[in-house]
Curated annotation (Swiss-Prot):
Protein name: Large ribosomal subunit protein uL30
NCBIfam families noted in UniProt: rpmD_bact
Single biological process term from Gene Ontology: translation
Highest taxon of source: Bacteria
Pfam family, one: Ribosomal_L30
Entry GO MF terms: structural constituent of ribosome
Database matches in CDD domains: Ribosomal_L30
Family label: Belongs to the universal ribosomal protein uL30 family.
InterPro entries: Ribo_uL30_ferredoxin-like_sf, Ribosomal_uL30_bac-type, Ribosomal_uL30_CS, Ribosomal_uL30_ferredoxin-like
GO CC, one annotated term: cytosolic large ribosomal subunit
Keyword field: Ribonucleoprotein, Ribosomal protein
Signal peptide extent: none
Length: 59
């Protein structure tokens, strides 16, 4: 089974760059305190790094 990470949105997407909003939607995050589980891949890690100020990651 592939390793997964939990990603939680901690800040609002209102007033953010359009690319950052698109990244949130790409990860499946829709609202504050929404948590999703994603596979720990370089692509997902890159998306999380781009919006690290808006999300919390748990291994």
């Amino acid at each position: 089974m592939a390793k997964t990470i939990k990603i939680t949105q901690t800040r609002s997407s209102i007033g953010r760059l359009p690319k950052h909003k698109a990244t949130l939607l790409g990860l499946g995050l829709r609202r504050i305190n929404h948590t999703v589980e994603r596979e720990d891949t370089p692509a997902v890690r890159g998306m999380v790094n781009a919006i690290s100020y808006m999300v919390k990651v748990e291994e």
